[in-house]
């Protein structure tokens, strides 16, 4: 039987990291894009491990040397998606998955588009980051019952509504055991860089505590999964 060929959208992007690489990138992406050796959040990493990880990211083309040669620069298309992880106002939904088999390539369709997950053959396991347009994410979260359908959720048109709705942001990161093709963990972003596009009616006094708690959850979850596999 001839295998069906699936054409993926040219706009779809995917990035595969080891746990150490992702931890390094997340630690380096707050409001800045430069990666150096004195990065907040990396105090527990040995300098040799940081250097080795940076070399790996350079080889993958995910970071570049700056012109002055003193630091490294995360490529713009990747930095834009990673920056949402370093912002204060992120809410995450954690889904622990066991024994869930995935094909070598999975096609996710949103409004006629395809987004892909492709485990990296060169890693025993790795992190896969999947992105989608904001309008697609809104639809998915509303379908999951995680965002209201009513008028309390409004897409803010700051410049051009069509452009704003198509702006891409981080949707999901997965930790994949690439040898067995099993998803060993997943973090789903309920709200990320949509902050500048979404407006909620009313105020929640507990909002800041919730954001801080959720951000600690993702940090603890990533550290637990990374340390368990001996990558940090």
Predicted segments with their positions:
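Short acidic, hydrophobic short linear motifs in intrinsically disordered regions
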Residues: 27-46, 54
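Basic amphipathic alpha-helical segments that dock to polyanions
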Residues: 49-61
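Short amphipathic alpha-helical segments
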Residues: 46-50, 133
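Non-catalytic recognition/regulatory regions in large multidomain proteins
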Residues: 2-23, 31-39, 64, 71-232
């Amino acid at each position: 039987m001839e295998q069906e060929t699936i054409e993926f959208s040219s706009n779809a992007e995917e990035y595969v990291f080891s746990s150490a690489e992702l931890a390094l990138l997340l630690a380096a992406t707050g409001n800045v894009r430069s990666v150096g050796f004195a990065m907040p959040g990396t105090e527990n990493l040995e300098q040799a491990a940081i250097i080795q990880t940076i070399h790996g990211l350079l080889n993958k083309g995910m970071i570049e040397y700056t012109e002055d040669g003193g630091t490294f620069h995360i490529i713009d298309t990747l930095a834009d998606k990673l920056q949402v992880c370093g912002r204060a106002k992120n809410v995450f939904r954690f889904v622990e998955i066991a024994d869930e088999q995935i094909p070598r390539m999975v096609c996710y369709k949103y409004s006629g588009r395809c987004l892909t997950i492709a485990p990296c053959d060169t890693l025993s396991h790795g992190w896969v980051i999947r992105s989608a347009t904001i309008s697609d994410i809104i639809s998915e979260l509303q379908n999951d019952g995680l965002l209201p359908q009513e008028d309390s959720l409004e897409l803010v048109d700051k410049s051009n509504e069509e452009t704003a709705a198509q702006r891409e942001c981080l949707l999901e990161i997965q930790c994949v055991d690439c040898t067995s093709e099993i998803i060993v963990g997943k973090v789903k972003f309920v709200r990320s860089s949509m902050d500048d596009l979404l407006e909620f009616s009313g105020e929640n006094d507990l909002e800041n505590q919730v954001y801080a708690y959720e951000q600690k959850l993702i940090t603890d979850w990533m550290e637990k999964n990374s340390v368990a596999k001996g990558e940090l």
